[in-house]
Amino acid sequence: MYELNNFRSIKIALASPEKIRQWSKGEVKKPETINYRTLKPEKEGLFCEKIFGPTRDWECHCGKYKRVRYKGVVCDRCGVEVTKSKVRRERMGHIELAAPVSHIWYFKGIPSRMGLLLDMSPRSLEKVLYFAAYIVINPGETPLTEKQILTEKEYADAIEKYGPKFKAGMGAEAVKGLLESIDLDAMNIELRHKLKESTGQKRIRTVRRLEVVEAFRKSKNNPAWMILDVVPVIPPDLRPMVQLDGGRFATSDLNDLYRRVINRNNRLKRLLDLGAPDIIVRNEKRMLQEAVDALIDNGRRGKPVTGPGNRPLKSLSDMLKGKQGRFRQNLLGKRVDYSGRSVIVVGPELKFYQCGLPKQMALELFKPFVMKKLVQENYAHNIKSAKRMVEKVKPEVWGVLEEVISQHPVLLNRAPTLHRLGIQAFEPILVEGKAIKLHPLVCTAYNADFDGDQMAVHVPLSVEAQAESRFLMLSINNILAPKDGEPITTPTQDMVLGCYYLTIQDEGVLGEGTIFKDFEELLLAYETKAVSLHAKVKVRMKLSAEDSGKLVESTVGRFIFNEKIPQDLGFVDRSKDLYALEVDFLCTKGALGKVIGKCFRKHGNTITSIMLDYIKELGFKYSTRGAITVAVSDMDVPEAKAELISQAEQRVDKYEKAFRRGLISDEERYEKVIETWTETTEKVTDALMAGLDRFNNIFIMADSGARGSKNQIRQLGGMRGLMANASGHTVEIPIKSNFREGLTVLEYFTSTHGARKGLADTALRTADSGYLTRRLVDVSQDVIIRELDCGTETGIVAKAFKDGNEVIEELYFRIVGRHSIDDIIHPETKKVIVPKGDIIFEDAAETITEAGIEKVAIRSALACRSKHGVCGTCYGRNLATGEPVKVGEAVGIIAAQSIGEPGTQLTMRTFHTGGVAGSDITQGLPRVEELFEARKPKGLAIISEISGKVDISESKRKREVTVTDENQEVVTYTIPYGSRVKVKQGQILEPGDEITEGSVNPHDILRIKGVEGVQTYIIKEVQRVYRLQGVDINDKHIEVISRQMLSRIKVEEAGDTELLPGSLENVFAFELANQKAIEEGGEPATGNIALLGITKASLATDSFLSAASFQETTRVLTEAAIKGKEDHLIGLKENVIIGKLIPAGTGMKRYKNIAISTETDEKLDEIEETL
């Protein structure tokens, strides 16, 4: 086998007839497959052993030669070479066609490549190819023109009139003649000349033709190769035929399609030999053309060829495209050996880096390792007996398994793997039963619960894989979430509840005010029930044995909680107080997150993981001790409720009357009613919350962040309030009851609308979110950190994102973990807070915001000058580790996952604004999609093109806003009916400012404000959607994606470069072409940055493998083949497809020459053979 890692690129081009014959091992002449009696392949048929190789290893067809010793011998009786049967997966055959046929991809694709080259409309071309009309090949001295289309009658007339003076033909043969006579160089010069003169539609067509001509010129493809004289036959094992139980056969559709081609081809040969009448031959040629079309791409033209049950047959193109096609099913998603799956159960006794693996599963997964060990330890004499021991599960096996398994990490994965934390490594511990045990703290990352979820286990086999699992993927190394750098292993539910209960402080309880000499005495007093867990006591705290110490006051629970928590996390200023407890506050979920975050930054992951296990144990222990439960009596309905509701009802009646008298419109009445009930619900809730005891169990659950929220308490003990109906419109009749009192039938019915919509939305959202993630991954998969610093001096100016007075994202979050471009100087003290080029750490970012600095220039992926990917300095800190990012980190994929993973949490709703036209502003997931696809948004806002002063004029007919700039230039905007004007009379506007409410078209911003303006807009708008849902995502992820959306230039004028007008070029390729033109003293090309949506950007990538495996497979491959594209295997996807190591992380070139030394494992290879 050739070394996979040896080639640098992969090229695709048109195959010439000679090339197809060269690939082939023989011609397939008969449509037969296998003999129905002997079940052996027929000679010269579709499964012929002479052409494709033997069906059995080392055995010829007739049985004269059997065994390995005849390797390479060609049998003199049956002509089959004695070799391995797997050659049937690689040997190809061919069919010599009696008449040429066209390749449907090049004739039928959009735009039709054949049509553009011949300058014919696809319709006329189709008539010629399918024998409905004649085409003039050589007009001779007649008044006919070349490529003129003649009907049957016109042709007959012309023959009568001119006789043999001209030449016309039909079918692929005629087209082939025309294609052969094309002079590409002359055509290129002619088209470029035309381009300078033409405008409008003509120019567009000329550019398209020029593109195809250039593609053929540069790729050295011959246009005539778009017509096939020979059809290749793919290897038989890729279109298998298998016998089913009932003696029937199941076969691949391709065999049917090939059979049709062979039958029609043979019939045509026979007719030609017989010299049949022209009309019959023509019909047969047409049928052959249709058969080849169906084989290549069934259903592309006309009705698809169907099999039994009217099912369209799967052609070669169908084998490649879609989710079940070759690319996505087999090349990008392979099934792997050494894996298993089982149900998960919780394992609270596990350490943070451990998982419980069922014994039987472990034995099966580690079978070869166990067998090797059994032979080594002399339990078995050879591999075969070791295998028998394992299969019979002898008692010695378990001891050996324990040894093998220790120090050998396994990978656990839960589908759907939405981000990289969906696969983590653990050290396995053998457990009884058949369920995998999972540590409770990693559930958040996996989004796992124990209601029947299943997980898959994978065994990393090689030493390299084990090293990577241990040092990069072990759960301890995944404490922070890559999307925002916050801890993702925060305790949840019971653990939070226990910690909250433990750290509550109560007045006047048993043992309050007692003084203890040390912590042990306190613990003894608590265990003997002499002091309450919540009592405030004093304990003498010492830093060492010699230290006299100091009395510290806190609750018993907080002393217990602090026992194993590092006391230098920064909650207490240790310069002022050495002895106070570090965590001397009520521990809610958020507070615990802060503790973990500070511990990680201060002490790293090892100490943090020990602390996490301690918090977990405490939490479970004290939530059990606290015995916090839910009872009906915990929900007290506030007494003020009845009074508040009756007041609201009176107000609603008042509005009804006013409406009936015609004092207010129905719209106003509706809005006032909704407002009244919303206020009332709030008041009832406030009354309820004020009346709840701090020790009320339901309040404890909600307040601690363990489960439930204020909104749910309202529904239990207050009133449910207003509900939405299926269209998302609020129903004006509220639900006055709560769940404690029970709902009336009508109320229950009202609430079902919104509830069902919620469920339907969730199902749709999951699919949409998954598709968005897929597109994001595809557009950014080749963004890898390729160098430490690209050396650029530019970046972006970060300031807080605001919407009016409301802050969407504070400056702190935008600058932390980034490199500064200039020295950042304190405005008052004039000290340098952060020197030029340094990372802005948390404390520096806090100092900057406290100093009142509003703008900070930072390095950004948006301004990075790395040719492929981005550089480490522009990217900044790796959020998952808190360290500067390393070369080789696949930041593009991380960005896509970070944006896509919370996608399911976003809502689907479109937001109804009041007003008649009610312009719907899209929100939630559809809004994110709209932004990344750079679509024209719904509810479009009008924006100002110039800067200047506003003048608003209203007449009966229309409203107008006029903007006048300093040079007295005036632009007038007509405001459509129902739009809300955002600006005020006399206001000064900047270019790009909104005049009416709504969303702005990003293409307008690009035109008016330029690239930086549109980048800022995309980041701000995406952040707005996510922050509204309470999801924090770091800006740099959105920057990586928007960098990809703006990485192309649309060429306007080509100048003296080789670029084509209207083509999309890579920014760096464009600069290079211009540089070359200027050096040669020519005119450079002009162009503008194009804003592409993520789907378009993915398909515009330089790698044809990546684009083909994404969408529109046939279109991408057609174009790539004509251009003779070469894929330089820069991104991850291309390398996965061809089976190379990905060029990220340890797969980068710089790590190629590192060898890993280990004990030799030749034994294992031998075991593999046995298995």
Curated annotation (Swiss-Prot):
Q: Which cofactor does it need?
A: Mg(2+); Zn(2+)
An example GO BP is: DNA-templated transcription
Summarize where Zn(2+) 1 binds, as residue positions: C60, C62, C75, C78
Per the record, its GO cellular-component terms are: DNA-directed RNA polymerase complex
Which SUPFAM superfamilies does this chain map to?
A: beta and beta-prime subunits of DNA dependent RNA-polymerase
Enumerate the residues binding Zn(2+) 2.
C790, C864, C871, C874
Task: Please give one Gene Ontology molecular function term for this protein.
Answer: magnesium ion binding
Keywords carried by this UniProt record: DNA-directed RNA polymerase, Magnesium, Metal-binding, Nucleotidyltransferase, Transcription, Transferase, Zinc
Q: Which reaction does it catalyse?
A: RNA(n) + a ribonucleoside 5'-triphosphate = RNA(n+1) + diphosphate
Under which EC number(s) is this enzyme classified?
A: 2.7.7.6
Which family is this sequence assigned to? Answer: Belongs to the RNA polymerase beta' chain family.
Q: Which HAMAP family match?
A: RNApol_bact_RpoC (MF_01322)
Q: What is this protein called?
A: DNA-directed RNA polymerase subunit beta'
User: What gene codes for this chain?
Assistant: rpoC
